[in-house]
A protein has these predicted regions:
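Helix C-cap/helix->beta junction micro-motif
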Residues: 25-28, 135, 195-196
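PLP-dependent aminotransferase-like
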Residues: 90, 109-170, 191
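A short helix->loop->beta-strand "cap" motif at the edges of active sites that frequently abuts
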Residues: 116, 137, 195-199, 225-227
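Active-site phosphate-binding strand-loop segment of PLP-dependent enzymes
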Residues: 145-214
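Conserved core segment of the aminotransferase class I/II
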Residues: 224-297
Length: 301
């Protein structure tokens, strides 16, 4: 059999490999200290669970969900305005994802041609590199160093790389360093992107899990952000919905639109009960988010 050459550049996900090792140890009765994927162990609120159950009882919920529910997109818009002070167009700037991981894996297929350069932070979440590799793109790693508080230094990116780069991924609050980006950093990122015609993809999964009185903001809060980029956000960390795969892509209309077109050829939308549970998460009592944050901070301390 002859398989795609792109698979030569892809290895099995590190999380899958580690999970296999964990299962082997469990079968042998050996102790396991699991520092792998970091799946949240705090369950969703009962209100979220109840909405999901009730929707799952409805026969119509099992039809194709080709289009995102209008009320889901409106809930995203309301949440982004209330939480981040960001205004979104409900029709053109919001897209449901089957988890932000799915969107991050597919976005390079929508933005890149083979041989294009993608700028990713280093160290970073594995899919940041895997997605571009699937698209045939080349990776340039932007170092995050302790001496700069783990903030990318755009002036250290070589001129020839910047000239050729198609898009770059930012991820703050950062996984794995925990760094939080400053206002000045985002302003520099947007200016850099405009100077070199580079699109920005911001991964904002951890904005609600910020400790010590600090604030996690949206990249889209900053002037000019929508001109150059999009943001992915997750329900896994804030609402404990890691297994109910749901995420969002918001921001630049053209970038959201091209990802929507790609996804229309890949899947037929998200299971309606999960969309409705996500609506409850975004529009319901947000105390669960604060309680979750406090729990994680207590564990850290």
């Amino acid at each position: 059999m002859r398989f795609s050459k792109r698979m030569e550049y892809l290895k099995k996900s590190v999380f899958s490999t580690l999970n296999e090792e964990r299962q082997k140890r469990e079968v042998l009765g050996l102790p396991v200290y699991d520092f792998t994927i970091g799946s949240p162990d705090i369950a969703p609120s009962q209100a979220i669970i109840n909405v999901l159950i009730e929707s799952a009882r409805q026969p119509k919920s099992y039809m194709y969900a080709i289009h995102d529910l209008p009320e889901f997109k409106q809930a995203v818009c309301d949440y982004y305005f209330n939480r981040y002070e960001v205004e979104l167009d409900v029709n053109s700037e919001v897209l449901a994802l089957q988890g932000s991981q799915e969107g991050l894996a597919h976005i390079a297929l929508a933005l890149c041609d083979p041989g294009d350069i993608v700028l990713i932070p280093s160290p970073s979440y594995p899919v940041f590199a895997a997605g571009p590799k699937m698209a045939g793109a080349e990776i340039y790693e932007m170092e995050m160093l302790e001496e700069y508080d783990y903030l990318i230094q755009f002036d250290q990116i070589p001129e020839d790389i910047a000239q050729k780069a198609k898009f770059m991924i930012l991820s703050y609050p950062n996984n794995p360093t925990g760094a939080i980006a400053t206002d000045a950093f985002y302003e520099q990122a947007i200016a850099f992107a405009k100077q070199y015609d580079i699109m920005i993809v911001s991964d904002n999964a951890y904005s609600n899990l910020v400790f010590d009185g600090q604030e996690g903001r949206s990249f889209l809060y900053y002037e000019g952000a929508k001109d150059v980029g999009i943001e992915f956000n997750s329900f896994s960390k804030s609402y404990g919905m890691a297994g109910a795969r749901v995420g969002i892509c918001v921001g630049n209309e053209e970038m959201v639109g091209v990802l929507r077109t790609l996804k229309s050829n890949i899947d037929y939308g998200m299971f309606v009960p999960i969309q409705k549970a996500a609506i409850e998460a975004l529009s319901g009592d947000q105390q669960i988010v604060e309680d979750t944050r406090k729990t994680y901070q207590k564990r850290r301390d």
